[in-house]
Every structure is written in C-alpha cells, then in structure tokens.
Curated annotation (Swiss-Prot):
CDD domains referenced in this protein's UniProt entry, alphabetically: GT28_MurG
GO terms for MF: UDP-N-acetyl-D-glucosamine:N-acetylmuramoyl-L-alanyl-D-glutamyl-meso-2,6-diaminopimelyl-D-alanyl-D-alanine-diphosphoundecaprenol 4-beta-N-acetylglucosaminlytransferase activity; undecaprenyldiphospho-muramoylpentapeptide beta-N-acetylglucosaminyltransferase activity
Domain of life: Bacteria
Organism lineage: Bacteria, Pseudomonadati, Pseudomonadota, Alphaproteobacteria, Hyphomicrobiales
This protein's encoding gene: murG
Name the record gives this protein: UDP-N-acetylglucosamine--N-acetylmuramyl-(pentapeptide) pyrophosphoryl-undecaprenol N-acetylglucosamine transferase
Reactions catalysed according to its record: di-trans,octa-cis-undecaprenyl diphospho-N-acetyl-alpha-D-muramoyl-L-alanyl-D-glutamyl-meso-2,6-diaminopimeloyl-D-alanyl-D-alanine + UDP-N-acetyl-alpha-D-glucosamine = di-trans,octa-cis-undecaprenyl diphospho-[N-acetyl-alpha-D-glucosaminyl-(1->4)]-N-acetyl-alpha-D-muramoyl-L-alanyl-D-glutamyl-meso-2,6-diaminopimeloyl-D-alanyl-D-alanine + UDP + H(+)
Amino acid sequence: MTVAQPLVLLAAGGTGGHLFPAEALALRLRERGIRVVLATDSRVETLSGEFPASEIVSIPSATPSGRSPLARGAALVTLGRGFAAALRVVRRLNPAVAVGFGGYPTVPPLLAAQMLRVPTLLHEQNAVMGRANAFLARGATVIATGVAQQVRGVPERARARRVHTGNPVRPAVLAAAATPYPPLAVEGPLQLLAFGGSQGARVMSEVVPEAVARLPAALRARLTVVQQARAEDLARAEALYGQAGLAAFSVAPFFKDLPARMAAAHLVVARSGASTVAELAVIGRPAILVPLPGSLDQDQAANAAVLGAAGAAFPRPQTDFTPERLAADLTGLFGAPERLIAAAAAAKGAGIPDAAERLAALVVETAIQASTR
C-alpha cells in the first residue's frame, strides 16, 4: 500500500488506559483520510465501543509475570501463538506504519511489524517506560512520549529517537475542557469526584465514603459526591453516603460521561494512570492522586509526581490513603479555595490538548520518511 493511500495498524491492550489514546489518534488519522485497523486482545469486547477503525482484529496475548514458572511458560506459549497470528495479519494488511500503545498485547503485532520491516512507532504514556515498550524500543523507528520530562527506562540506544507529543485525549475530554472551573463560594456547593480508572478500584470504595462521613456536618451539607465503584461495593458505599447528610450523591460502576463529570468537579480523587493524569490536565482539575501500589515499575507514582511537581495535584501513597488522612485533606482543601483554584490553573497549564494531532503528524512523517528510503 502506498503512502498516498495509507493504512495504519494500531496495537493497544483492551483497557481504557491503552485504548483511549489509541482512539484519539485513530480519529485524527481518519480525518486525514487514513484507514485504521486496531489489533488488540479479547478484553476489547467490553471496552472498545465504537472504536474508529475499519477493522478490529483480536490477537492472542498474555502477560508473562507472576511467580509460577508454569504460568509464565503458558503466557510465553500464548504470546508465540499471538506472534504467528500477527505475522499473518501484518502480511495481509501491509501497513504503512504500526503504532503500539504499550502492554503485552502490543508485543506480537509490533514485533511482527518490525520483523517484516514495517516502520514502527511506540507511544509511551507513562513517566516510566513499560516493559513491553522497552522490549520493542530497540527496533522501533520512533518513540513518542506522553510526558516532557525524561522517561525512565528507555533503552540507551533508543533515546535519540524520542519525540514528545503528549498523551492523546478523546473528543469528550476536549469538549469538557471548555468548561471553566466551577465557582467556589464560601458557603456554596462543592462537588467531589472519585474513581479508580476504567477497571475501578476497591480502595476508593473502602476509603472515600468513610472519609466523607468524617467531614464536619456543615461541609457535608454542601457536598455532592460522585463515585465510581465496583458492583460488589455499590451497596456499602450508597449506605454510607445515604447516612452522611450530603447535598447529593451518585454511585455507579461506570460513567460513560466521566470527562463531563471531571469538568463539574471542584476536586477529584483518583488513581494516576497516564490517561487519567492527561485528562485531568487538559480539563484543568485538581486531584488527590493515589498511585496503584505494587507495580514493579512504579509508573503511576511517577505520573502523579509529574502533576504534583507542577502544583496541579496532591499525590498520596496508598499506605497513607486512610479515611482519617483523606478527611483531613478534604477539609483542608475545601477550606482553602485559593489552593484549589491555583491547582486547577496549574493542571490546565500542564495539559496538551493537541497531543492527538501531534502524534498523527508524527505517524504521517514516519510513513513518508520510510517510503523515501
């Protein structure tokens, strides 16, 4: 296929953190008249919705982690099957460029593309390069990064190929970014949003309702809480909020309009995945960020530190994320509107709303340069 009528293969794991930036890029590429095919794993069936691709192919994948040698061996066998399937897909499509968004589901299609001499572009959303991207980086044509700071974990010989584009965000996020920060009056209404990423987070359901119940009664009476909670945690969260004397509350397993709910919030409590951090920055909302613990790479801690250093967020390790500590944080922040307003402005200043367009331009440039060699 020629660059004049290009096809771009996107590879992304089937979670929101990987799919959202891929979706944003796909929309920009489609606007340029470029055909997009998405390669992903079976999880996409629950999260992809109407992904803007002319074709979606599911490729076997697994993560070779854990202590069990048997489990790791089985994962490697699955990845091998995925690689064989990916070779067939890449040969059939003959893409101008293959773009990977991290996670082990991207390894088979990107490795197949590299072996077939298709130009490959990696997008690293986090402040620490993931293991899959690090494995693929040596053979990548170019590496796009979501953060301006030096990304840790990039192989030394691949560092010269880095380009900072920012993290692409969905159209719904760009629409929400047009909403000004809500006014903060001394006795006026307050809105708190709590969520744990596209997969939810139990710790939010364990800590946030208990913390809200500890707030002063006058503060609770002004407060509306919107929280994403896992289905098994809904009843408990609703019961606690129902007894707290709040102005209003809403608890659900998933919010399709989450960007709009971010825009309506005075303060957000969330994990610090790359997409969440990028969306908070583009919309311009202050947040208490609780990085996911236990990660070998500590990527969420690094992401939270980026916004924290900008004055846009208040990072809290999960060991310190207790009802008592969160109640103190909420009381202090809601009692100091100037801190929230300053953090909102700092978040807005850290956002890159045109990241999808920057990345699309880099994809096209990569295809053109490859075609002229």
